[in-house]
Amino acid sequence: MTDTAIIETLRTKLSIAGGRHLYAVLGSYPQLAKFSSKLLQAKTTEGETFPKPVSVNSGILASIPDQEFRGLVEDEARRPEPTAKHVAQAFEKFLRDTLLAKGLVVLERMELVFAYHLELNHLRTLAADDYRILLLLPGKRDRGKVVLFPEAGEATYMLPTNLIADNNLWELGR
């Protein structure tokens, strides 16, 4: 789909009051950057500008105090589970704080979420009624599945099929 078509469809869906509001746009990093620029120029049906995309990686790292972060980095190779648990807690806190403050949030740069195989259902649970989440994901559709980081070869990540409704998931044109 084109940037404009996705934005128009998104505007319509965001105007619906109730229900699940988890959306995603797939594309390459350059395509997502271009889409972000166009999204920032667009207006919602209420006449407001779309929010600037927020880096999930930065949000997670910012929520971990420096001293604690140093300890996690030093221990990660020997004990990866506590680090993953800590990153998961930081992700959930960042997500709740960001969403509650804004109502509509555009999330990008989520590599830490996938690197640590964090639970994604929090996104779906929180994106309901007055809270809306748009994910900008580096990926593509492939044989009915959503493949993230397709250039990574065997290190790709498959998005769970039931996470985002098919009609709330758009792929930028190639």
Predicted stretch roles:
Residues 1-47, 118:
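Glycine-rich P-loop/Walker A and Walker A-like loops and their local beta1-loop-alpha1 context
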Residues 22-24, 50-55, 156, 166-171:
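Conserved beta-strand scaffold positions in the cores of enzyme catalytic domains, especially
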Residues 28-30, 59-61, 137-144:
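Short beta-alpha junction loops
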Residues 41-52, 125-134:
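Structural alpha-beta junctions
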Residues 48-71:
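AAA+/P-loop NTPase substrate/partner-engagement loops
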Residues 64-105, 109, 116-125:
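Conserved nucleotide-sensing/catalytic segment adjacent to the nucleotide-binding pocket
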